[in-house]
From Swiss-Prot:
This is Phosphatidylserine decarboxylase proenzyme. It comes from Rhizobium etli (strain ATCC 51251 / DSM 11541 / JCM 21823 / NBRC 15573 / CFN 42). Belongs to the phosphatidylserine decarboxylase family. PSD-A subfamily. Is synthesized initially as an inactive proenzyme. Formation of the active enzyme involves a self-maturation process in which the active site pyruvoyl group is generated from an internal serine residue via an autocatalytic post-translational modification. Two non-identical subunits are generated from the proenzyme in this reaction, and the pyruvate is formed at the N-terminus of the alpha chain, which is derived from the carboxyl end of the proenzyme. It catalyses: a 1,2-diacyl-sn-glycero-3-phospho-L-serine + H(+) = a 1,2-diacyl-sn-glycero-3-phosphoethanolamine + CO2. The gene is psd. The record marks G189, S190 as: Cleavage (non-hydrolytic).
Amino acid sequence: MSLFNTVRNTIVPVHKEGYPFVAAFFVASLVLGWIFKPLFWIGMIFTLWCAYFFRDPERVTPQDDDLVISPADGKVSAIQMVTPPAELDLGSEPMLRISVFMNVFNCHVNRAPMRGRIVSINYRSGSFVNAELDKASEDNERNGLVIETRHGQIGVVQIAGLVARRILCWANTNEPLDAGERFGLIRFGSRLDVFLPAGAAPRVSLGQTAIAGETVIAEFASAKGPVISRHS
C-alpha cells in the first residue's frame, strides 16, 4: 500500500470513501501487469486518476456568519429565484437558488455553506439525467438538508448526475455544522443546490468556477439572530 500512502500523504489526501476504489484499481493493475507488463502501467494511470477523483484537500473557509460558502467544487450553473423542493418543507415562497455543477474532474467532497444546525435530512429516489439540466432538480435522485442558521433556514440539496449513482451523507439530524465542514460526497459527476431565504444576495456569476469551502457565493446584509455553534 506504499503507493496509496504516497498519494494520500504526499500529493493530496484521499477521502476514505475512495480507499476501496483506489485499492481495487491497484490490485487490478498488478494482476494485469502479471499477464502483460505494459497493462500494469495502463492500470496505474487509472489508479492515479481514481485517487485524484477522491482527493480531499484542506480548505481555508472565511469565518463570517453573513457569508454563504460554496458547498462544492465546480461551475456555477444557475442563479435564480425558485420554489424550493417540497420535501425540504421550506414553504412555497421563492428562494434564491445557486447551483454548482461538478464534472468528473472536480473534487466531489461536499461542505456546509454556513454555520448552523441540521433540522432535517430528506432523501428522494429518482432518475439520473444530466445534473446540469434544470429538470435534474425535480427528476433526479437527491438528498436534501435543511440547516438552521442565524439568518433562518437554508436548504442544501445533493443531486445525482448522469454518471453518479451514489449520494453519500454522513451528517445527522440535530447535529451542528461549521461553515466549510465536510458533510457528504457524490461519486462521479453531480450538482449541489443551495436555497437561501430573503436577504441573501448572490456574489458569483454564471459560469464562474467555485471552490468548496472557500468561494463566497452569496451574502446576507446583516445578522438576524444569534450565532449557532456546537455548544448552542
